[in-house]
Structures are given as C-alpha cells and as structure tokens.
Amino acid sequence: MALERTFSIIKPDAVAKNVIGAIYNRFESAGLRIVASKMIHMSKEQAEGFYAEHKERPFFGALVDFMTSGPVMVQVLEGENAVLANREIMGATNPADAASGTLRSDYAASIDENAVHGSDAPESAAREIAYFFSEEEICPRTR
C-alpha cells in the first residue's frame, strides 16, 4: 500500500446543495485525511487552465461555464492509495452508472453536474494539487 495524495473538487452543484460536510465525512470515513482545503470561486481563466486538456472537446465551454457558476471546494486528500480510494468514493462519472452509496449516486443530478472531481492518476494529482495549492498550504497529518 502506498501513501499518496490526490486532488478533489466539490463542484458548484454540490456546494449549492449544502453537502460539503457530508462529502468530507465520506472522505474521512474511508480513511482519507484532508490535508488542504479552501473555497474558491473559479475565474474563467482558472477553469480554462485547469481543464485545458479538454479544450478541443465539444463540452469544454459548458464545463467552464458550470465550474465558474458558483463556489467550489478544492481539497488535497492523503491516504493509502488515495487516488483509487477517492475514485471509488466518487463513483462513475455518469451518476446514472454510479454504484449506490457513491457520491455521484447520492449527490449528482447529471453527467454535466456530477458533484465532484477527482484526479485519475498520481501524475495528474500532483499537477492538479500544484494548480491550486502551494506546498506551504498543505499540512501533512502526522497525528
């Protein structure tokens, strides 16, 4: 088992539903520790930069509009195999396909407004964490 970090976003739809605490409880109940967290309202430039890999996809404009439509919570999660653990907690990208009891099954309305984002690999996690957090903002949990 490898101790690793992953990046997570609670998207505008879930923030609007006031389920931040419930989502944090799921992370912690699964053994993940929140080592950095902040609420931000992404600018168009931030959202375009973060999702730059999707720039040529037909959904890019709608994704940027959605991610800038309200505040989001960005956080760094740490734990054993954190990337995979968080992806299991989130469930399938499309909430219609998400297993019962996952975040997307419980809190997402559609594939477009699917409540949460999580890194898909340790390499993307490192890049995404650095996009929103300086090393000084991350507080390792040693106790």
From Swiss-Prot:
Keywords in alphabetical order: ATP-binding, Cytoplasm, Kinase, Magnesium, Metal-binding, Nucleotide metabolism, Nucleotide-binding, Phosphoprotein, Transferase
Q: Which reaction does it catalyse?
A: a 2'-deoxyribonucleoside 5'-diphosphate + ATP = a 2'-deoxyribonucleoside 5'-triphosphate + ADP; a ribonucleoside 5'-diphosphate + ATP = a ribonucleoside 5'-triphosphate + ADP
Respond yes or no to whether keyword Metal-binding is given for this record: yes
Which InterPro entries does the UniProt entry name for this protein? Answer: NDK-like_dom, NDK-like_dom_sf, Nucleoside_diP_kinase, Nucleoside_diP_kinase_AS
Q: Which PROSITE patterns match?
A: NDPK, NDPK_LIKE
Output the GO biological process annotations, alphabetical, semicolon-separated: CTP biosynthetic process; GTP biosynthetic process; UTP biosynthetic process
Its quaternary organisation is: Homotetramer.
What name does this protein carry?
Nucleoside diphosphate kinase
Give the organism, scientific name.
Alteromonas mediterranea (strain DSM 17117 / CIP 110805 / LMG 28347 / Deep ecotype)
